[in-house]
C-alpha cells in the first residue's frame, strides 16, 4: 500500500490556517474536524457500491446505488484523536467507534496503553485509525498492534500532519496499510514534536496547556 498526501486546495488552505500561532481553540477544533471529513472522503474512494431499487417521491421505482456491506470502525487515539471523530462520522455516520488510550513518555518518547475498547467482529471491519499527529509513530504502531491482536485484518490511518520519521516507521513495519495525511512536514525536533507542525494538537483541541 502507500502514503497518500491529500493535495486538495481546501485541505492545504485549512492546514495552513491551523499553523498560526494565535489560533483559537474554537477555530483549531473546527479545522481539525473539517480536514478529518475530507480525509475520510479520500480514504473511502474504493468502497464498493451496489444497485438497489427504491420507491421515489412520486411512487415510481428508482434505481440507486448504495454502499456494499463495508463495515467500518473509527479508532480515535486518545485524546487528540477525539478531535477528528465528528468529522469522520459526518462522512461515515454508520461507523462504529473503538477507542484506544495511549500516553507518551516525554523522556523515552515510548507509548504506553492505559485504555482500549474495541467493537465486536473486528475481523469483518475496516478500521480507520485517527490521530492528528503522526510523529515518532510509536502510538500508531501500538494501536495497529492492538487491532491486529484483536483480529482486525483491514486498517487505514488518517492524520493531519506526519513527520518523515513516523511515516518511515509505519510503512516499514506495516507496508500493507494505507496512510492518508493532509501534510507531510520536515522533521521531528529533539522532543519528538513535528516541525513546522501544529504544536500540541491535544492541548489546542481541548484548550489545555
Curated annotation (Swiss-Prot):
<dbReference type="GO" id="GO:0000287">
    <property type="term" value="F:magnesium ion binding"/>
</dbReference>
<feature type="binding site">
    <location>
        <position position="79"/>
    </location>
    <ligand>
        <name>5-phospho-alpha-D-ribose 1-diphosphate</name>
    </ligand>
</feature>
<keyword id="KW-0808">Transferase</keyword>
<keyword id="KW-0547">Nucleotide-binding</keyword>
<comment type="similarity">
    <text>Belongs to the UPRTase family.</text>
</comment>
<protein>
    <recommendedName>
        <fullName>Uracil phosphoribosyltransferase</fullName>
        <ecNumber>2.4.2.9</ecNumber>
    </recommendedName>
</protein>
<feature type="binding site">
    <location>
        <position position="104"/>
    </location>
    <ligand>
        <name>5-phospho-alpha-D-ribose 1-diphosphate</name>
    </ligand>
</feature>
<dbReference type="InterPro" id="IPR050054">
    <property type="entry name" value="UPRTase/APRTase"/>
</dbReference>
<dbReference type="InterPro" id="IPR005765">
    <property type="entry name" value="Ura_phspho_trans"/>
</dbReference>
<dbReference type="GO" id="GO:0005525">
    <property type="term" value="F:GTP binding"/>
</dbReference>
<dbReference type="GO" id="GO:0044206">
    <property type="term" value="P:UMP salvage"/>
</dbReference>
<comment type="pathway">
    <text>Pyrimidine metabolism; UMP biosynthesis via salvage pathway; UMP from uracil: step 1/1.</text>
</comment>
<feature type="binding site">
    <location>
        <position position="194"/>
    </location>
    <ligand>
        <name>uracil</name>
    </ligand>
</feature>
<keyword id="KW-0342">GTP-binding</keyword>
<dbReference type="GO" id="GO:0006223">
    <property type="term" value="P:uracil salvage"/>
</dbReference>
<dbReference type="InterPro" id="IPR029057">
    <property type="entry name" value="PRTase-like"/>
</dbReference>
<dbReference type="GO" id="GO:0004845">
    <property type="term" value="F:uracil phosphoribosyltransferase activity"/>
</dbReference>
<dbReference type="InterPro" id="IPR034332">
    <property type="entry name" value="Upp_B"/>
</dbReference>
<feature type="binding site">
    <location>
        <begin position="199"/>
        <end position="201"/>
    </location>
    <ligand>
        <name>uracil</name>
    </ligand>
</feature>
<comment type="function">
    <text>Catalyzes the conversion of uracil and 5-phospho-alpha-D-ribose 1-diphosphate (PRPP) to UMP and diphosphate.</text>
</comment>
<dbReference type="InterPro" id="IPR000836">
    <property type="entry name" value="PRibTrfase_dom"/>
</dbReference>
<dbReference type="Pfam" id="PF14681">
    <property type="entry name" value="UPRTase"/>
</dbReference>
<keyword id="KW-0328">Glycosyltransferase</keyword>
<keyword id="KW-0460">Magnesium</keyword>
<feature type="binding site">
    <location>
        <position position="200"/>
    </location>
    <ligand>
        <name>5-phospho-alpha-D-ribose 1-diphosphate</name>
    </ligand>
</feature>
<keyword id="KW-0021">Allosteric enzyme</keyword>
<feature type="binding site">
    <location>
        <begin position="131"/>
        <end position="139"/>
    </location>
    <ligand>
        <name>5-phospho-alpha-D-ribose 1-diphosphate</name>
    </ligand>
</feature>
Amino acid at each position: 500500500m502507500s502514503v497518500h498526501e491529500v493535495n486538495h486546495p481546501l485541505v492545504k488552505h485549512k492546514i495552513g490556517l491551523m499553523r498560526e500561532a494565535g489560533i483559537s481553540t474554537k477555530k483549531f477544533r473546527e479545522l481539525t474536524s473539517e480536514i478529518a471529513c475530507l480525509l475520510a472522503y479520500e480514504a473511502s474512494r474504493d468502497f464498493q457500491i451496489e444497485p438497489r431499487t427504491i420507491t421515489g417521491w412520486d411512487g415510481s421505482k428508482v434505481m440507486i446505488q448504495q454502499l456494499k456491506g463495508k463495515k467500518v470502525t473509527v479508532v480515535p487515539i486518545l485524546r487528540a484523536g477525539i478531535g477528528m471523530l465528528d468529522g469522520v462520522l459526518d462522512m461515515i455516520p454508520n461507523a462504529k467507534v473503538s477507542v484506544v488510550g495511549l500516553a507518551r513518555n516525554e523522556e523515552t518518547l515510548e507509548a504506553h496503553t492505559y485504555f482500549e475498547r474495541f467493537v465486536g467482529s473486528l475481523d469483518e471491519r475496516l478500521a480507520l485509525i485517527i490521530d492528528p499527529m503522526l510523529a515518532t509513530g510509536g502510538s500508531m504502531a501500538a494501536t495497529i498492534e492492538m487491532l491486529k491482536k484483536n483480529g482486525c485484518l483491514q486498517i487505514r490511518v488518517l492524520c493531519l500532519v506526519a513527520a518523515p520519521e513516523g511515516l518511515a516507521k509505519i510503512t516499514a513495519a506495516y507496508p500493507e496499510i494505507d496512510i492518508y495525511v493532509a501534510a507531510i512536514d520536515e522533521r521531528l525536533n529533539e522532543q519528538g514534536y513535528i516541525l513546522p507542525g501544529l504544536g500540541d494538537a491535544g492541548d489546542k483541541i481541548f484548550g489545555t496547556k
